[in-house]
Amino acid sequence: MSLSRAAIVDQLKEIVGADRVITDETVLKKNSIDRFRKFPDIHGIYTLPIPAAVVKLGSTEQVSRVLNFMNAHKINGVPRTGASATEGGLETVVENSVVLDGSAMNQIINIDIENMQATAQCGVPLEVLENALREKGYTTGHSPQSKPLAQMGGLVATRSIGQFSTLYGAIEDMVVGLEAVLADGTVTRIKNVPRRAAGPDIRHIIIGNEGALCYITEVTVKIFKFTPENNLFYGYILEDMKTGFNILREIMVEGYRPSIARLYDAEDGTQHFTHFADGKCVLIFMAEGNPRIAKATGEGIAEIVARYPQCQRVDSKLIETWFNNLNWGPDKVAAERVQILKTGNMGFTTEVSGCWSCIHEIYESVINRIRTEFPHADDITMLGGHSSHSYQNGTNMYFVYDYNVVNCKPEEEIDKYHNPLNKIICEETIRLGGSMVHHHGIGKHRVHWSKLEHGSAWALLEGLKKQFDPNGIMNTGTIYPIEK
């Protein structure tokens, strides 16, 4: 027999103390969603089941005890730290869920210069860790636009990526070891070593699990020397995306690793570079690190781009100014909310990836299908995209779309606009051989395509859920679709 809402709250207070169990209605409503539902949130409308409580966890031991209790009574838990998620992964879709807030677990445990790694609890803000490292002349190399908001546990749980990934890699390339708590309360640690061949890499059971398998409590990541004085900026305008993708490919294949390598189409580029884009596509690069490496990287990029006469160089100071204003902190989020409430104009992104052979077709097919098939295409005020993370064998594509919310209630905006646009992007990307999600995580709104995304490999993911969360208490509806 399931526990009542009141009984759940009482038991949680017994486990962690009354001061750590929040039942204020305003807090509960805010914790029932993430930024995927920012339009109804701005209008004060919350339609999902409100959680029974938000638990402010203070230690791994508390996480263990709380999960043990919840597992015994089959209570759904939603792990949460910085709450910068954008894909619905933090939504509470089950009645009487409990939000497991790890933001109070915010200690930097160790900065180990000799072994070039740093260990932090799940609630340490990335910006706090980064600033502590920069004071010593080092960096994580991880710099998502959410850096002022995001915390370490969520960054690892969502398999996040930073703006300098083409040089430093994504979060999975940075994580050395970690600690996590399984659904039954068992604490597991993966030790910090540079590499091993002792079976499959079990870090990857935890990295990217989105709270659907376990709760990440501590992470150790690599660190790198921080030398911003060596940064070199390059910018170009060009006529078409196909040429831009070809240039990105040549740079990667020839072995150059700029920290930033971005290609904007004309519509998306106009949003950021009105002062010089002139309605054209935009290529941006930054080289950094050891001065000799940065210089060689910059020279290599310039040489490759010079093979394409249509590309026109722009003043590097313009690119540096853009670079210095990239991140989204609390002030930008607050300003966006005011603007949305005032204008009714929404902006979202959906990021995918593909090999070099299919990425341009993905881009063109998605844009064309949205313009010709989406029934509310006339409400779209901007539709474009950019590539911002490249690899030896391919790149990502960020589809960026703004639309006016017309003739619908705030709570209807998602199903009228956002979900149908996501559907087109996911369907076209999978059809053409790409991945429907590059770095935001599946969350609860791309979960409909999880099985199609993985194909015959879905059995492996399904096996992990059965093994590590047999009672299905971990973030129901994320990664794994709810079976009806």
Curated annotation (Swiss-Prot):
One GO MF term attached to the UniProt entry: oxidoreductase activity
Transmembrane feature ranges: none
Domain FAD-binding PCMH-type intervals: 47-226
Enzyme class: oxidoreductase
Biological process annotations from GO: lipid biosynthetic process
InterPro entries in alphabetical order: Alkyl-DHAP_Synthase, FAD-bd_oxidored_4_C, FAD-bd_PCMH, FAD-bd_PCMH-like_sf, FAD-bd_PCMH_sub1, FAD-bd_PCMH_sub2, FAD-linked_Oxase-like_C, Oxid_FAD_bind_N
PANTHER family according to UniProt: ALKYLDIHYDROXYACETONEPHOSPHATE SYNTHASE, PEROXISOMAL
Family that this chain belongs to: Belongs to the FAD-binding oxidoreductase/transferase type 4 family.
Name the UniProt record assigns to this protein: Uncharacterized FAD-linked oxidoreductase YgcU
Organism listed in the record: Escherichia coli O157:H7
